[in-house]
């Protein structure tokens, strides 16, 4: 998360996350699921809605995979309508969801309620053995969350973009002894220091 994208209200919210709201801990648990449920490179399938493609989160997860050395965290962006001639990494369509299987993870990212066609595909992927993770907002999406093995809602006081940054950072954390030097709480504290001075 870049400091220039964080305003005063978000600084207050982020400080609240550090102060023990519980959300940061839930994000860490969710990040661990992102990190451990895909069993091979290419097995983390990231999909949004017809109106929202999670480009930025996919890029952040790719960075975290590279920095942490966790190959299975490298995401595959699944798109509703890839344009003709798109490069291979941007040409993966919904047929990939139909091929999802045990050992793969379908990560659904949506700021709005998931449309019925998406819910149907997600449910089918679960039936074939894929792990379903969901990131949404506010009080969550009841229908999507009921299908997901793990779901996390970004609080309304935090932008969805900021929430995606924090989730991707959590996914890149190593477990104790794994050698990752900067944990999620550390990274958030450094961000706040750069924006408004040291945290209490």
Please describe what each predicted stretch is.
Residues 55-176:
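Glycine-rich phosphate-binding loops that contact phosphosugars or nucleotide phosphates
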Residues 1-74:
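Extended, compositionally biased accessory segments flanking or bridging domains
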Residues 10-14, 27, 34, 90, ...:
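Generic structural signal of hydrophobic/aromatic residues within well-ordered alpha-helices
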Residues 162-200:
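A charged, well-structured terminal subsegment
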């Amino acid at each position: 998360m870049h400091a220039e994208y964080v305003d005063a209200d978000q600084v207050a919210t982020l400080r609240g996350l550090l102060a023990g709201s519980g959300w940061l801990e839930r994000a860490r648990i969710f990040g661990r699921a992102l990190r451990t449920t895909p069993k091979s490179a290419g097995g983390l399938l990231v999909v949004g809605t017809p109106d929202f493609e999670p480009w930025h989160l996919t890029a952040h997860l790719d960075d975290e995979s590279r920095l942490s050395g966790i190959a299975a965290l490298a995401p595959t962006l699944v798109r509703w309508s890839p344009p003709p001639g798109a490069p291979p990494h941007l040409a993966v369509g919904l047929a990939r969801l139909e091929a999802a299987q045990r050992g793969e993870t379908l990560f659904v990212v949506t700021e709005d309620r998931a449309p019925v066609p998406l819910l149907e595909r997600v449910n089918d992927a679960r039936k074939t053995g894929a792990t379903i993770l969901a990131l949404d907002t506010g009080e969550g999406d009841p229908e999507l969350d009921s299908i997901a093995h793990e779901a996390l809602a970004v609080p309304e006081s935090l932008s969805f973009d900021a929430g995606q940054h924090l989730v991707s950072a959590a996914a890149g954390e190593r477990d104790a002894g794994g050698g990752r030097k900067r944990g999620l709480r550390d990274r958030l504290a450094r961000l706040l220091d750069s924006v408004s001075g040291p945290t209490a």
